[in-house]
A protein has these predicted regions:
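Conserved N-terminal helical subregion
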Residues: 6, 73-74, 79-160
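Glycine-rich FAD pyrophosphate-binding loop
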Residues: 11-13, 24-47
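Conserved Rossmann-like nucleotide-cofactor binding loop
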Residues: 18, 41, 157
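Short alpha-helical segment within the catalytic ATP-binding CA
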Residues: 20-21, 54
Length: 160
């Protein structure tokens, strides 16, 4: 019996915020993408993101913005303080939001659900990135995969 060979345009190693959003954006452009992540579940990330209008539009294009409906807070006032100037720099707009604050975990959860629903993500997978080369076979869970391009998105926790 012959093993099935899987061919993809992109392998993305790391399903954090950047890796996950990149995978979705490439999928929307009709590329065949597989994303692998070492961690099996999401961390309890309490950080927030300030999202400007362009980023909001990007998240809308990906179909993720509406998934955050109950977890968005408008930015109505921005105060910038530094150690050089005595006066704070204040931006305020009472007519429209200057952006939106969202939780990292909420956005990543929505992105991961999108990837998981389409079977584009494999978690609990640790690859030796030193041995991976584009257009060379990669063994994942006893299956053979080929990728034209590889994106490594390991973020701040990467150690070589």
């Amino acid at each position: 019996m012959k093993n099935k060979i899987f061919n993809y345009d992109f392998l993305i190693i790391g399903a954090g915020m950047i890796g996950s959003l990149t995978a979705i954006a490439l999928t929307k452009k009709k590329y065949k993408v597989l994303i692998v992540e070492k961690q099996k579940s999401l961390n309890d990330d309490k950080r927030t993101l300030a999202v400007n209008a362009n980023s909001r539009d990007f998240l809308r294009e990906l179909g993720l913005w509406n998934k955050l409906a109950n977890e968005k807070e408008p930015i109505k006032k921005i105060i910038i303080k530094d150690s050089i100037n005595k006066e704070d720099l204040i931006f305020q707009n009472s007519e429209e939001s200057m952006g939106t604050v969202i939780y990292n975990k909420s956005l990543l959860k929505a992105a991961r659900k999108y990837l998981d629903d389409r079977k584009l993500i494999m978690t609990g997978i640790e690859l030796d990135i030193q041995k991976i080369k584009p257009s060379s076979p990669v063994k994942i869970k006893k299956e053979t995969f080929y990728f034209k391009k590889i994106i490594i998105s390991l973020g701040k926790h990467f150690s070589d």
